[in-house]
Amino acid sequence: MSPLVGVLALQGDVREHVAALKDSGAEALGVRRPEELGKVDGLVIPGGESTTMSNLLRVFELLDPLTERLRAGLPVYGSCAGMILLASEILDTRPDAVALGAIDMTVRRNAFGRQVDSFEGDLDFTGVDGAMHAVFIRAPWVERVGDDVEVLASAQGHPVAVRQGSALATAFHPEVTGDRRVHQLFVDMVRAG
């Protein structure tokens, strides 16, 4: 049976993640309400704008239920803004920004620069064969990881893909490249969870 993976559908590149999850053998559901969050076996937090997503988590009354599900071990994958939200500490953000603490890491928002500084490149990604083409759009990077955090890929000397237990995060956007290996890894994590 295919796992049901939610995509936080408050803002960001939701459709692209839904398509990537379906291509990876999962059923996908846009999550906008606590009752939808309660149905899923795993959750993707997409790219977008992390401070806006922080506010929308409160507006849609998802912050507390999401925090509870993450503490209970819900498998989660965050790309770009999703990586920022999953961090235990966020640098260069507003004081009211949400840090869900699903991964013991310090992340710097927009670390690679502004929109004009966005770039693409090939990465070595632990656990997948061959180079992975990565698209970085106003991307964060990781400045510190805890002892239990595995660094899966780095760019320009900084971690850009990490995993801790049932939580996975990338600074880049695999959903826009057509390469489904990150999503397949996450769907496999959900199945194993």
Curated annotation (Swiss-Prot):
One BP annotation, GO: pyridoxine metabolic process
One GO cellular component term: glutaminase complex
PROSITE patterns, A to Z: PDXT_SNO_1, PDXT_SNO_2
CDD domains reported for this sequence: GATase1_PB
Active site: 80, 173, 175
Keywords: Glutamine amidotransferase, Hydrolase, Lyase, Pyridoxal phosphate
Known pathway: Cofactor biosynthesis; pyridoxal 5'-phosphate biosynthesis
Binding-site list for L-glutamine: 48-50, 109, 137-138
Transmembrane segments: none
GO molecular function: glutaminase activity; pyridoxal 5'-phosphate synthase (glutamine hydrolysing) activity
InterPro entries named among the record's database cross-references: Class_I_gatase-like, PdxT/SNO, PdxT/SNO_CS
Entries under Pfam families matching the protein: SNO (PF01174)
Catalyzed reaction equations: aldehydo-D-ribose 5-phosphate + D-glyceraldehyde 3-phosphate + L-glutamine = pyridoxal 5'-phosphate + L-glutamate + phosphate + 3 H2O + H(+); L-glutamine + H2O = L-glutamate + NH4(+)
EC number: 4.3.3.6, 3.5.1.2
Quaternary structure annotation from Swiss-Prot or TrEMBL: In the presence of PdxS, forms a dodecamer of heterodimers. Only shows activity in the heterodimer.
Protein family per UniProt: Belongs to the glutaminase PdxT/SNO family.
Known role: Catalyzes the hydrolysis of glutamine to glutamate and ammonia as part of the biosynthesis of pyridoxal 5'-phosphate. The resulting ammonia molecule is channeled to the active site of PdxS.
PANTHER family linked to this entry: PYRIDOXAL 5'-PHOSPHATE SYNTHASE SUBUNIT SNO, PYRIDOXAL 5'-PHOSPHATE SYNTHASE SUBUNIT SNO1-RELATED
Protein name: Pyridoxal 5'-phosphate synthase subunit PdxT
